[in-house]
Regions:
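Non-catalytic accessory/assembly modules
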Residues: 142-149, 162-170, 217, 221, ...
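Active-site SXXK
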Residues: 70-84
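N-terminal secretory signal peptides that target proteins for export/translocation
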Residues: 1-6
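M16/insulysin-pitrilysin zinc metalloprotease superfamily fold
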Residues: 83-86, 117-148
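Non-catalytic beta-strand/loop surface segments
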Residues: 23-62, 88-122, 158-212, 236-263
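Non-catalytic, conformational "gating/processing" segments within enzyme and secreted inhibitor domains
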Residues: 148, 198-233
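Short pre-active-site segment immediately N-terminal to the catalytic Zn-binding motif
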Residues: 61-69
């Protein structure tokens, strides 16, 4: 490599690394604390734009479910948008949309999470809505009757009609014969067909407690601001006894397992 090429390469490298080093220098520390009711709060400051991301993570997911009751965590995620003490079905989403916010939720093997992205001065609205459904979810039977059909159609579209998704589902069932990782997050269709509001209510009351949740806020905020808002809204939610989650265990491998899929 000649001198000109080395100089050009060095300039290119410095151009790439300089923004990264500046970003590393600007990173703010992560703050963590708990409310008296056990809610864990994590705050990460990022003042580049007047925006915040607010997330509530519950320590429950499809791996917590038992045979015959699969899909409860995912179905409950859907029903969390169907009304609580302060708002009716879908009203929380309309409030957030009018504020220009984005929201969504997702369920996995070990957790269920809900989040909003919105202006920093609207964080209290997100907290109020999230705390309300943590404390007083309604679960109207008529809403469940409609929503379970949406979930079943979601399963048909994303799993039953998708060879790769179906193959992975069967692979997981074979790879984890003993633990909760055996079952798909959306649940088996036979369990969706017989799911009841009572089962969802039991799941909600068991796991959706402040002492089984983590509130994460990242954005243009300070820890003191978040702590004050969290105490104002989430601090009023009563702590509840939460079951001890079983550690996922698998039996010793009995030997070679073979899965054949014909498509």
């Amino acid at each position: 490599m000649n001198a000109l090429a080395r100089r050009a390469a060095g300039l290119l490298l410095s151009t790439v690394l300089l923004p990264l080093s500046a970003l590393a220098a600007d990173q703010q520390p992560t703050h963590e604390f708990r409310l008296d009711n056990g809610l864990k709060v994590i705050v990460r400051e990022d003042h580049r734009a007047p925006v915040v991301v607010s997330q509530v993570w519950y320590k429950v997911g499809s791996s917590y479910e038992t045979p015959g009751k699969t899909g409860l965590s995912h179905a409950l995620e859907h029903m969390m948008f169907k009304g609580s003490n302060k708002v009716g079905p879908g009203e929380a989403s309309l409030i957030l949309r009018d504020l220009g916010a984005q929201e969504n939720a997702f369920t996995s093997d070990d957790y269920t999470a809900y989040y909003q992205v919105l202006a920093r001065d609207r964080l209290g609205v997100a907290f109020e809505l999230e705390a309300d459904r943590m404390a007083s979810l309604r679960l109207p039977p008529e809403e469940f009757k409609r929503e379970i059909e949406v979930i079943k159609e979601e399963r048909r579209l994303r799993t039953d009609d998708q060879p790769m998704s179906k193959a992975f589902e069967l692979f997981s069932a074979m790879a984890y014969p003993s633990s909760g990782y055996h079952t798909p997050t959306i649940g088996w269709m036979v369990d969706l067909e017989r799911m009841s509001v009572g089962e969802l209510r039991a799941c909600y009351e068991e796991w959706y407690a402040p002492n089984n949740a983590t509130l994460v806020v990242v954005g243009d905020v300070t820890p003191d601001e978040v702590k004050a808002l969290a105490q104002r809204y989430f601090g009023q939610v009563a702590k509840r006894e939460v079951p001890v989650a079983k550690v996922p265990l698998e039996l010793p491998t009995p030997g070679e397992r073979l899965l054949k899929i014909h498509v």
